[in-house]
């Protein structure tokens, strides 16, 4: 079968190793190139080496890593009322709460010393510095004829580094002229930001089936090396939808449309390393053209 037009000269650019799998499982085998941004994370000293082992064994023939270090910004924005700034999502009081509760994949005992050593200003500065580093690293890789797949503007489940990567690539799209595509994952946490990208009319999109066997094979590779960052009970959706990503957020419309969303819920962990998710695999979860905003 011939490749879909959007998969010609195609590249997935994902923030963290396993993002390429979680949000692009239907196209992962068929894209021409995969680029992953981050390896090391100060709160998880082992994870960089583990990720490098996965990349070395990755079954796709063209996977590279930028080898950047995570900023630690995950969970640092107020997702009940997210504010976009030049670097991504504005970090704020949630930074304090995240450090005190050990919100991003770590227990209190292991995260707090590392975070306290650096401090809240360090996380903000690292997040801001990464914006420029991403621009410099990605600009020479991109051409006008490319189809670039990356995180959606709300960061799927509300991840600050996902939003930042989208905004970097959105700026480079305006500069270089490639097509920028996003997939359709969203959560209760990210919905306030996602709704700012709804439009007056639904746009065109492409729907593709998820290769669940291939996805699980790759998930097992991450699990083998101890760097699978997602819940063990995650269940793949049957399909994914892709559309060209909108640029500007706006105030939510009275009647807004986007495209079918793969909606799932996420609760903040209390004592577990992993985030708890509940996949809404019903028709309401995967086939709404507009969420609770249209009849």
Where are these regions (language model features)?
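Active-site rim/loop-helix segments in enzyme catalytic domains that contact anionic ligands
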Residues: 1-143
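The feature marks non-catalytic terminal segments
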Residues: 97-111, 117, 175-295
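Charged helix-capping and loop-helix junction motifs
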Residues: 162-170
């Amino acid at each position: 079968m011939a490749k879909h037009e959007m998969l010609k000269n195609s590249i997935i650019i994902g923030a963290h190793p396993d993002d390429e799998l979680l949000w692009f499982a239907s196209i992962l085998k068929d894209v021409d190139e995969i680029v992953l941004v981050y390896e090391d994370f100060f709160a998880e000293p082992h994870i960089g080496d583990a990720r490098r082992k996965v990349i070395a064994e990755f079954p796709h023939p063209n996977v590279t890593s930028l080898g950047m270090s995570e900023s630690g910004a995950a969970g640092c924005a107020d997702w009940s009322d997210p504010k976009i700034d030049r670097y991504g999502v504005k970090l704020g009081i949630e930074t304090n709460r995240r450090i005190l509760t050990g919100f991003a994949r770590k227990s209190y005992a292991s995260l707090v010393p590392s975070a306290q050593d650096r401090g809240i200003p360090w996380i903000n500065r690292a997040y801001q510095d990464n914006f420029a580093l991403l621009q410099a690293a990605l600009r020479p890789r991109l051409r006008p004829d490319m189809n670039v797949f990356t995180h959606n503007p709300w960061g799927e489940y509300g991840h600050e580094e996902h939003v930042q990567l989208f905004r970097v690539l959105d700026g480079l799209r305006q500069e270089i002229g490639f097509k920028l595509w996003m997939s359709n994952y969203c959560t209760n946490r990210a919905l306030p930001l996602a709704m700012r990208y709804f439009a007056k009319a639904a746009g065109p999109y492409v729907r593709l089936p998820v290769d669940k066997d291939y996805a699980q094979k790759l998930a097992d590779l991450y699990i083998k090396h101890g760097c699978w960052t997602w819940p063990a009970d995650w269940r793949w959706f049957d399909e994914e939808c892709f559309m060209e990503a909108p640029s500007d957020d706006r105030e939510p419309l009275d009647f807004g449309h986007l495209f079918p969303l793969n909606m799932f819920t996420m609760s903040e962990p209390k004592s577990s390393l992993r985030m708890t998710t509940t996949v809404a695999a019903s028709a309401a979860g995967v086939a709404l053209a507009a969420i609770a905003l249209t009849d």
